[in-house]
Amino acid sequence: MEYQSGKRVLSLSLGLIGLFSASAFASDSRTVSEPKAPSSCTVLKADSSTATSTIQKALNNCGQGKAVKLSAGSSSVFLSGPLSLPSGVSLLIDKGVTLRAVNNAKSFENAPSSCGVVDTNGKGCDAFITATSTTNSGIYGPGTIDGQGGVKLQDKKVSWWDLAADAKVKKLKQNTPRLIQINKSKNFTLYNVSLINSPNFHVVFSDGDGFTAWKTTIKTPSTARNTDGIDPMSSKNITIAHSNISTGDDNVAIKAYKGRSETRNISILHNEFGTGHGMSIGSETMGVYNVTVDDLIMTGTTNGLRIKSDKSAAGVVNGVRYSNVVMKNVAKPIVIDTVYEKKEGSNVPDWSDITFKDITSQTKGVVVLNGENAKKPIEVTMKNVKLTSDSTWQIKNVTVKK
């Protein structure tokens, strides 16, 4: 695999990815193939009115295995407040149609005056779309979901992203809604849909089993703080494939939290990342196992392949495979960092069985291997890792095997 004019040039074997079904590289224990959109139970037509209650009623009345289809009418935009997906029911957004979040903080608050403010909590907003304890639900395109993160709120003098910037300055937390929040669910699908301008994280899959994002496009400015692309948290059996992700934070961030399930069996296959903070594991790493990242192009991310944590959130990371990755204009192509934010705590990183194979960075960068806080020296295996001659290495308490 090589990089050419920002596009893929694949070998014959990878040229057959249209036939992909649970690639040999996969760590996801499921057999995963390209999803198919379900048939619709009803079709809604867009007009100029706010459609929250109309869409929610249609979702509640839709039979399992079916989808509510959003199509163009007198308008191509559905304006809506927070929505909840029932179990077994999906949302299908037609070509050229946008489901747009209302730009009103009050609509998202989960307690009086809790959303659209900066405080020490940061949990005062409902997500735009929530799925909790669902099985076989999903969101399908080829339409778009727009979080309006950069638009001034009607009931505030600032945008969601302004709040995030203000929180950073004040060392507090912004109360801004995530775009899609999936909790304790099984076999959730995101297919052929575009996600733009999220106020906060775009997609979170938390405490679940079975998540597929396929042909998903995420595009949010690099300056939009805390706008992670896709974050699997304390979950298992995840596939992110054939997707294109550009954000203002981690393109993908795999996390595992204390007191919750381990995160395991993750496949990140045949993707392209633009701006963002890279393909990350952490900073919550209290049990991450069996991760495969294969056939990835990264252009303009601040970091490339990164495992990050510190004493406040570290734990076991084991069985991580990176292969066939090409990077360009990536400041730090490879990062292993046990002192990510220098936070204090009693947790010790225990990271092992980490392999980098057939990795190319085409522009100058810095490789950071910092095992300062590790339980024991971290061993990483590097095979056919190609960097430019002017790239540099920073190594502390890490052993590199070839």
Curated annotation (Swiss-Prot):
Residues 1-23 form the signal peptide. It holds the Pfam family Glyco_hydro_28. The active site is at residues 249, 277. InterPro entries: GH28_Enzymes, Glyco_hydro_28, PbH1, Pectin_lyas_fold, Pectin_lyase_fold/virulence. One of its GO terms (cellular component) is extracellular region. It comes from the Bacteria. Monomer. Belongs to the glycosyl hydrolase 28 family. Involved in maceration and soft-rotting of plant tissue. This is Endo-polygalacturonase. It comes from Pectobacterium carotovorum subsp. carotovorum.
